[in-house]
Amino acid sequence: MNKPSLRLLASFALPFAALSQDAVTTATPKAAPAGKAPAVVYFTHDISPDGLAKAYKALGRPLEGRKVTVKISTGEAGNNHYLKPELIGPLVQSLKGDIVECNTAYGGSRQETPKHRKTIEEHGFNAIAKVVIMDEFDQLDIPCPSSSSHLQKDLIGAAFTNYSGFVILNHFKGHQMGGFGGALKNLSIGVASTSGKARIHSAGKTDKTPDCWRMLPPQKDFIESMAEAAGAVVDYMGDRAVYISVMNNISIDCDCNGHPAKPEMADVGILASLDPVALDKACVDLVYASDPKTSASLRKRMEKQLGPHILDHAEGLGYGTKSYKLVSLDGNEPPSTKRVD
């Protein structure tokens, strides 16, 4: 198979940290659509197992007692920016969760199950949990939001439906094709089977690889297709899911890139919400609120690829809101989300 171009590649469970009321500080809420309250997005500067546990607990949606899955990106061979096992292991193990992934749609170390399993082992994930490749044996369609423009159904790894509790654990960074990768990208491309990824990348024209790389739609249609696929997964999970994003090792390139650009931005923190759209919006806002010298490349990447449009389309589909209030878990004011130019 021809490899796609740069455009195509677009034993330690810890107790949860106790949260005191004086450790929670709220930023001024952003304006919400009429009749809809802003979503709460929790924030901590503490990028550590304790910080991750604190963010999870703050959400107030315990998944203990359910059959839990933690959806991450295991990272392409050669990439070292993915969320490391030593960071996420304590949370995964405290929930007795499985890690889940799907095979990719491009030539690399994760397109086929045997090579993917080798990469998973090399990146250390087998040491912290059982890892399930969701589309190893089967795939299935789930309906997209009724007002979707490009996709009627999202084709996902069938093993996703074996679970009753979902932690969508995202590494926020840039992305060659999507502009940025966060919760919505993890929900859409991340949960889709190889054929489902082809469907999203082609905006519904084909489920086949490598055909999808020869049938790329206008960029706006691709971005909207990701939003629609993410909506299908959000609707399927309902109130059984939590969403957490880690803003560290923030390259302009995705963890699916085996030779990513070196991160230029400083690490930011961990964010968590019950609303994946608000979560991604807060992460994007924090990029624009950061030093414009170090965030310039990521801003350019997001804008060139129409990345923020996924937020508009997702909100329009009705499964999330861009309006949020940022709540600090560190006992101080949350970081400013005001744009800095």
Name the predicted role of every residue range.
Residues P29, P33-D341:
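Extended, low-polarity segments enriched in aliphatic/aromatic residues
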